[in-house]
Amino acid sequence: METVLVKQLYRETEKFAGKEVKISGWIRTLRASNKFGFIEVNDGSFFKNIQVVFGAELENFKEISKYAISSSISVEGEVVITEGAKQPFEIHAKKVVLEGKSDADYPLQKKRHTFEYLRSIAHLRPRSNAFSAVFRVRSLAAYAIHKFFQDQGFVYVHTPIITGSDCEGAGEMFRVTTLDMENPPKDEKGNVDYKEDFFGKQANLTVSGQLEAEIYALAFRNVYTFGPTFRAENSNTARHASEFWMIEPEMAFAELKDYMDVAEQMVKYIINYVRENAPEEMEFFNKFIDKGLLERLDNVVNSDFARISYTEAVEILQKSGAEFEYPVEWGIDLQTEHERYLTEQIYKKPVFVTDYPKDIKAFYMRMNDDNKTVAAADLLVPGIGEIIGGSQREERLDILEARMAELGLEKEDYWWYLELRKYGETKHAGYGLGFERMIMYLTGMGNIRDVIPFPRTPGVSEF
């Protein structure tokens, strides 16, 4: 007898109609009378459950009728088409075997639970409808990203998680050490002597793989990274996590416009791929999580993203007459309220904001001719704000060194990065997409903790 996934039965119903199959999964609901009963089974392969009908002719009918929610079972039976019924087909069971029983105190009973409560039981929340949908979409989106870049001829590069450099120059990094923190070795000045540490110097968890990706872009032309990054920011907002995933493409022989073109294509590709391959999940999100989600995503796919300079954005915000919590003036870092106003009230679609003041951007971004702004661009989307940040990289060694000196960065710490500018340097550009923010945008979920399997935030490292 053929063992099949529930997804196969839904996608190829006619093929299996009238045939005997075997499925395995977990009980979502069960109700029974004296003569027959119904079990909703989910095997994790598909968003929807499959209905199993079992009758009193089964020798273990009474035992089956008492199975608890979340018990795991195997079912053998015939696939029967049910025209006009709620479900398109069901399985008439000829054999039901209990694989593993569930205790009666199983937390996910048939009622609506808050997302906050479900975060406290992260080991069980994938079994709920909402999180079953979220993490299936997350999987599809990750695959879509790889497929997009592979089809475009990009090389996938694994950059280090443990690093000695700080890409952002922010200093908000998790330190990696094997020293005894209660009695660390000290140098002549009384400071911790990291020469005695495992790596012989200070080491941290990476905040970005960009600098290392640039190395490979200058050998392979177009590359991308996709991996975890870490920020030791004591921030408890719905948009920030201490551990998250980033997609970071780098392109040689490319300018700012090229990065924006690729980023726009990528975002549209991800949306289309998920819409096509997870229609049931997306309908669920549209109905129960964020009404209007599908319309908004369709608008993104079918529109040309707006492109405005930072200076233009500031002028628009100042002339809007809107009251913002953070006043708008040239030189500030745009806040989420400003970003959302631009995308939701002014343009009603995604917006690239370009040419930011150099003082609020990183050292590696290419200086513009005005010596006040850099060739940077952030992609802002309705409902969230920034999801992508990127720039053309500074390829001119003298200007890069001057910029580092201006910011107090030691050349010795970035000797290899500077050396790239000496051996066949070319214009190049890249960006970073926060994967979880993309998932939030795709699903309408309002908190980053609900699109990461095991969220890491200040004070939280369970599971």
UniProtKB/Swiss-Prot annotation:
CDD domains: AsxRS_core, EcAsnRS_like_N. GO terms for cellular component: cytoplasm. Homodimer. The keyword Kinase does not apply. This is Asparagine--tRNA ligase. It comes from Clostridium novyi (strain NT). It catalyses: tRNA(Asn) + L-asparagine + ATP = L-asparaginyl-tRNA(Asn) + AMP + diphosphate + H(+). It is found in: Cytoplasm. It comes from the Bacteria. InterPro entries: Aa-tRNA-synt_II, aa-tRNA-synth_II, aa-tRNA-synth_II/BPL/LPL, Asn-tRNA-ligase, Asp/Asn-tRNA-synth_IIb, NA-bd_OB-fold, NA-bd_OB_tRNA. SUPFAM superfamilies: Class II aaRS and biotin synthetases, Nucleic acid-binding proteins. GO terms for biological process: asparaginyl-tRNA aminoacylation.
